[in-house]
């Protein structure tokens, strides 16, 4: 899996397009960096840049952006609605793919140290990179903002993590760190700034102080007014959207606004958003309104509508959802991007990958897809109207499993490649040999994990498949018969792939546990597939 880190530096300039463009060029021209989004606001006088790349590349991209800003931004003249303490106010590094939080912490440390040494400016570490608990919170570090820095820097407790304890009027100070995806989500109100801020105080985790905490965990919020849009916003930062999601913030804001007789007129997402954040919101509205939507495209459209994400500007999923901008692998590497004819030809070529693992995953994925098809061929038809509620329940697991199993086609090939890469590591010194041995064992565990995940995924489908065999559209009987055997075959392939990769694993307890589990899953697949076929034959008779 290719490594990918997201960097989202916030610069204190949102009006001067020449400055905004110069910083954009500094990032875009950095080898290995892909600039995904530039979001500027005149009222906030702030621009948020989003770019991705390998860990070492995004550090260089952030430094190049800072160098450009150092020549062009003068904080002594800066005014804006958004809290800030420096020309490069905050620079977080965020794991996207194949990267741990610890690696992002190292990115923040490397960036902070080099920035301080080169430009001679104070740099603080926050979030997961913070060296003390008191510096984990960005608002706590920003307290008093730029204007308070001259006095704060004189105090020992506010000594920067890197750079001088000296005030640099043109720059201020920079905060660098590592964190999860932060969603900047603003809800639009036709109200005053004060009314929006009142709602923000009730919702944000900090609340109005220690004695009056807010309702929403992992949420920061303030109220402000956007002159260019002639409306107010409850401006929020969702620090962990898996704790408090977009829909929760929006619905709670609507409830507060209703109590104050204030109209909510949509919302705004600043920067990029993970697909999961939108799908979580879609799941909420589907459950709330008893909706049946399978396709991500439809679910995203629902969320855009319910949250009013296009109220201030068009919301274009292909340009705003990070997974759509940065696919797992390029078309030249991904088996999934290749035509079926090419995939089959590569399987038959003189190469170990793609091999049985990828074929097993593809076979199981098609089995799940066939089951989904049978459900959809039953759902929504007048003659099967009495089964609509049942199909709404049965179809989604097959649809989701088909997508997951499809992704394992590439995952299996990547796992094998990781093992081959470990085989090529040097073994000249004892340290080299130890590193190589550890990498080989990790590669084998990955090679075991993929087919095991395949078998576990198929196992979760058998109850639904049994029920579908009893009530699905009988005209699709052969499709369901093939589905059952395809799923069984997928597990059959997974079983032998697990065993062959377990052979060289040195952890005996792990080997015994996995061998027992995969054997159980294979036996279950044989039994369940036979039962599905028997039930279909009985219905025919």
Curated annotation (Swiss-Prot):
Descriptive protein name: Formimidoyltransferase-cyclodeaminase
Active-site residue numbers: 82 (for formimidoyltransferase activity), 412 (for cyclodeaminase activity)
Primary location group: cytoplasm
Family stated for the protein in its record: In the C-terminal section; belongs to the cyclodeaminase/cyclohydrolase family.
Cytoplasm among keywords: yes
Region (Linker): 327-334
Region of interest called Cyclodeaminase/cyclohydrolase, as start-end residue ranges on this chain: 335-541
């Amino acid at each position: 899996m290719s490594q990918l880190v997201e960097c989202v530096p916030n610069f204190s300039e949102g009006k001067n397009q020449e400055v905004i463009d110069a910083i954009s060029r500094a990032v875009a021209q950095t080898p290995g960096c892909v600039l995904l989004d530039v979001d500027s606001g005149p009222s906030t006088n702030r621009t948020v840049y989003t770019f991705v790349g390998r860990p070492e590349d995004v550090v260089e991209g952030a430094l190049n952006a800072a160098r450009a800003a150092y020549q062009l931004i003068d904080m002594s003249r800066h005014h804006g609605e958004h809290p800030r303490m420096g020309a490069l106010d905050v620079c977080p590094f965020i794991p996207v793919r194949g990267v741990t939080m610890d690696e992002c912490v190292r990115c923040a440390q490397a960036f902070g140290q080099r920035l301080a040494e080169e430009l001679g400016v104070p740099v603080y570490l926050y979030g997961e990179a913070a060296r003390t608990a008191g510096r984990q919170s960005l608002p706590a570090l920003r307290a008093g903002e730029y204007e308070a820095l001259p006095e704060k820097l004189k105090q020992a407790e506010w000594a920067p993590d890197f750079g001088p304890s000296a005030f640099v009027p043109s720059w201020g100070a920079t905060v660098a760190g590592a964190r999860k995806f932060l969603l900047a989500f603003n809800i639009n109100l036709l109200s005053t700034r004060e009314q929006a801020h009142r709602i923000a105080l009730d919702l944000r985790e900090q609340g109005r102080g220690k004695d009056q905490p807010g309702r929403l965990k992992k949420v920061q919020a303030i109220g402000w007014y956007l002159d260019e849009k002639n409306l107010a916003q409850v401006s929020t930062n969702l620090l962990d959207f898996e704790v408090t999601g977009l829909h929760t913030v929006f619905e709670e804001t609507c409830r507060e606004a209703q109590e104050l007789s204030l109209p909510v007129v949509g919302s705004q997402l600043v920067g990029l958003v993970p697909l999961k954040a939108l799908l979580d919101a879609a799941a909420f509205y589907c459950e709330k309104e008893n909706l049946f939507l399978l396709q991500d495209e439809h679910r995203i459209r629902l969320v855009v509508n319910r949250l009013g994400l296009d109220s201030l500007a068009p919301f274009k999923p292909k340009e705003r959802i990070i997974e759509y901008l940065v696919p797992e692998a390029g078309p030249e590497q991904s088996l999934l991007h290749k035509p079926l004819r090419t995939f089959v030809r590569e399987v038959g070529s003189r190469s170990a990958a793609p091999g049985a693992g990828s074929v097993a995953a593809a076979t199981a994925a098609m089995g799940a897809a066939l089951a989904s098809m049978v459900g959809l061929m039953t759902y929504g038809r007048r003659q099967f109207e009495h089964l609509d509620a049942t199909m709404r329940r049965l179809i989604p697991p097959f649809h989701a499993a088909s997508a997951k199993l499809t992704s394992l086609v590439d995952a299996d090939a990547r796992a094998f490649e990781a093992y081959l890469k470990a085989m090529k590591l040097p073994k000249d010194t004892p340290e080299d040999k130890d590193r190589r041995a550890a990498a080989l064992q990790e590669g084998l565990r990955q090679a075991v994990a993929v087919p095991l995940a395949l078998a576990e995924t198929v196992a979760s489908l058998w109850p639904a498949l049994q029920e579908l065999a009893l009530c699905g559209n009988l005209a699709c009987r052969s499709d369901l018969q093939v589905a059952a055997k395809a799923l069984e075959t997928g597990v059959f392939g997974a079983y032998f792939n697990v065993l062959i990769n377990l052979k060289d694993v040195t952890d005996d307890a792990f080997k015994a546990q996995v061998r027992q589990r995969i054997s159980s899953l294979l036996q279950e697949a044989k039994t369940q597939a036979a039962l599905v076929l028997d039930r279909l034959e009985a219905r025919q008779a």
